[in-house]
């Protein structure tokens, strides 16, 4: 699929994410992160719900003409979709969360080529993504190599490569 066509689809989807979806997604994520340390959970949720709405707004404000037109492998799009559908628990708010995440993550991976987390996100141990000379380095890139992680699709390199 051509990137402009895929972007057009994502832009359409971005208008389907309502304020109620954002609220439901937040409740969902808070429940899904129940057993994480409170300070980590609080910071993660704050970063997530600052970053993802900003990216949604970016998608809505961007035109198709601003997107470089290149081929995206349909199989890669399907792989990301399947991975996103397998993440998290199946509780109330899941649909709203998926709607938000699918739109934003696909944009970040295939169109904008930016990290999947905000640069302000603090990971366990207090580390965060570092940007240096146009490259991004993540402290958990290689630590999250399980079949439920989406790290393999992220543009970030491992922090140890810095």
UniProtKB/Swiss-Prot annotation:
Highest taxon listed in the record's lineage: Archaea
InterPro entries per record: DUF2115
Pfam family, one: DUF2115
Family statement: Belongs to the UPF0305 family.
Name recorded for this polypeptide: UPF0305 protein MMP0665
Native species: Methanococcus maripaludis (strain DSM 14266 / JCM 13030 / NBRC 101832 / S2 / LL)
Lineage of the organism: Archaea, Methanobacteriati, Methanobacteriota, Methanomada group, Methanococci
């Amino acid at each position: 699929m051509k990137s402009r066509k895929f972007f057009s689809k994502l832009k359409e989807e971005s208008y389907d994410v309502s304020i109620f979806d954002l609220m439901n997604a937040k409740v969902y994520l808070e429940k899904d992160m129940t057993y994480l340390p409170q300070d980590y959970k609080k910071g993660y949720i704050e970063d997530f719900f600052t970053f993802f709405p900003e990216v949604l707004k970016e998608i809505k404000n961007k035109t198709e003409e601003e997107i470089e037109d290149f081929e995206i492998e349909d199989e890669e799009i399907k792989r990301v979709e399947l991975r996103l559908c397998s993440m998290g628990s199946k509780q109330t708010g899941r649909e709203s969360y998926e709607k938000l995440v699918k739109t934003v993550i696909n944009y970040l991976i295939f169109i904008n080529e930016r990290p999947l987390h905000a640069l302000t996100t603090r990971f366990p141990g207090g580390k965060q993504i570092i940007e240096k000379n146009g490259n991004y380095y993540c402290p958990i890139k290689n630590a999250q190599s399980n079949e439920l992680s989406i790290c393999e699709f992220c543009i970030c390199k491992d922090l140890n490569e810095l």
